[in-house]
Amino acid sequence: MGMSKSYGCFGYPLSIFFIVVNEFCERFSYYGMRALLILYFRRFIGWDDNLSTAIYHTFVALCYLTPILGALIADSWLGKFKTIVSLSIVYTIGQAVTAVSSINDLTDYNKDGTPDNLSVHVALSMIGLALIALGTGGIKPCVSAFGGDQFEEGQEKQRNRFFSIFYLAINAGSLISTIVTPMLRVHECGIYSQKACYPLAFGVPAALMAVSLIVFVIGSGMYKKFQPQGNVMGKVVKCIGFALKNRFRHRSKQFPKREHWLDWAKEKYDERLISQIKMVTKVMFLYIPLPMFWALFDQQGSRWTLQATAMSGKIGLLEVQPDQMQTVNAILIVVMVPIMDAVVYPLIAKCGFNFTSLKRMTVGMFLASMAFVMAAIVQLEIDKTLPVFPKQNEVQIKVLNIGNGAMNVSFPGAVVTVSQMSQSDGFMTFDVDKLTSINISSTGSPVIPVTYNFEQGHRHTLLVWAPNNYRVVKDGLNQKPEKGENGIRFINSLNESLNITMGDKVYVNVTSHNASEYQFFSLGTKNITISSTQQISQNCTKVLQSSNLEFGSAYTYVIGTQSTGCPELHMFEDISPNTVNMALQIPQYFLITCGEVVFSVTGLEFSYSQAPSNMKSVLQAGWLLTVAVGNIIVLIVAGAGQFSEQWAEYILFAALLLVVCVIFAIMARFYTYVNPAEIEAQFDDDEKKNLEKMNVYSTVTPVSQTQM
């Protein structure tokens, strides 16, 4: 029996307030952390796109495998309340460890702004994520069921409304966290150097998880807490195992066949349990194709976020971060669920179309497939604008003439003529082994060979200002600038060292005819102040303005002098800004969200309606398992494919889901809907009749024999 004090508010148990707040905070914590994860792997730890995607989906798969463990612990050992509290503690510790792992200064022993022992950060990250997966997955099947336990008989209406509020809390937590945590990430923090503030962005979700735990424990005295009733899932597994073994033992032709393979369990298990398991396995069979949907759906947080990093986030007056695009899904879900229930489905019914649950799920798969076709189209547009960076056995070189006369630079197979204060036409790519000689010449001057050990896999700028005066500068950018920022470096063509301030950042002691390192800036124009002790006249304006910076570009500013002796800026583009707008992702998010509404929500309703009353948790665990398998599919396909073009991977996933969609439609065509309540009622009637017969026999007085 459940034990609690009787508290109520507007006909609802007061205890559900604590459960709803707990769920909101927990979902904020989970989705806030998850929104950052792919960029944390890519930019902080430094993994490439494929490895980052693989680890991300491994983590998500674990989060959906551990609910089975949570259900087992709750049903057969601790009960729901103690399971939620215990695993929430594990969850909170995991979030805290992940936040600590992202502290840049933790291993920055030489204080240069870069972690000196990445393995420490990786190890802490993996420990933290493992604890989070155990915590979030373990409590997943318990919290909503624990909320449902708080209602009395006759409160079905309030219970149904509770689940609607509960679902709203999930989406509200997801929506707010995916807006807030990327905003925290773009701030800069650190002791020795200012870097993207992952500790704050991970720390806030960790704090919210602690709040979630505290709120849940505060309501302890108001909850109905039921003792574990035994492990239904264990009974199901044992019954299926016995049926298979018994069938194998009686496989010879001398034993008559039985109508269903589960009927081979009748020697040990009662017909009611066998009938219930038949209903469950019938639905589980339909689950087989479902993981393919989740394989596509969960790439919103990995591949689609990485896609957004190469796009422009300027949408009207808004500046959208790549990981904030995931909020489109949460916003559309909150809007579309009531629209589908109140408008779309009733209209379809009025048109006389029997839009069954399985038909809806088929449509959901098709829409998700089309979402990935849209993603591929967007990717093709992005690819047209992306710079090509050198491979491991290549180098890229461009020539920048900061002198007063034209210069000729000869490379193997090419001669480049660069006029004064201009650059060659972009970066030229050379195989390291074939880059045998580079020579500089100009009219009336001898040929001067360039001697420099070019580092393969990197870009280089060859600064020239006279035939015998040159400098090779290794560029520090081998990818688009992160977070949609803009990389800016300065080249000093004057004969003295300069200090340069741009916005709130300082370039200290940029020596003569040399380049600074890149520093990164947000959108807009910035003031540039040049400090000099000799060459620049005091009468000159030393505050200049940059160009209007956009998303994801890189520029070199060469500081020269006008005829008046005053400084002037010459701007050269190193990496062009992102031109494909993130708004182009909205159609693919719209399609995937439509697919989610008609697939996921309908799938849960279908599973609930087709499951026996005591086995709904078994089907819930099976449903969550399809999500885990879907993420494993991403690992297999992405790992085996190794596509050179991302759009091709999107098309592959779309094609796979389309094939699965057809298979599922055929399976659904032959599925017969059942009413578990009617079947169980029939068993109840049969048991009642048998009991009545037994009572009749027990009331007959036996005839006693007289002893002679």
Curated annotation (Swiss-Prot):
Protein origin, superkingdom: Eukaryota
KW Iron (keyword) present: no
Gene Ontology biological process terms, A to Z: dipeptide import across plasma membrane; protein transport
Transmembrane segments: 1-21, 54-74, 83-103, 119-139, 162-182, 199-219, 277-297, 328-348, 362-382, 585-605, 620-640, 646-666
Gene Ontology cellular component list: apical plasma membrane; plasma membrane
Entry comment, domain topic: The extracellular domain (ECD) region specifically binds trypsin.
PANTHER family: OLIGOPEPTIDE TRANSPORTER-RELATED
Job of this protein: Electrogenic proton-coupled amino-acid transporter that transports oligopeptides of 2 to 4 amino acids with a preference for dipeptides. Transports neutral and monovalently charged peptides with a proton to peptide stoichiometry of 1:1 or 2:1. Primarily responsible for the absorption of dietary di- and tripeptides from the small intestinal lumen. Mediates transepithelial transport of muramyl and N-formylated bacterial dipeptides contributing to recognition of pathogenic bacteria by the mucosal immune system.
Protein name: Solute carrier family 15 member 1
Native source species: Canis lupus familiaris
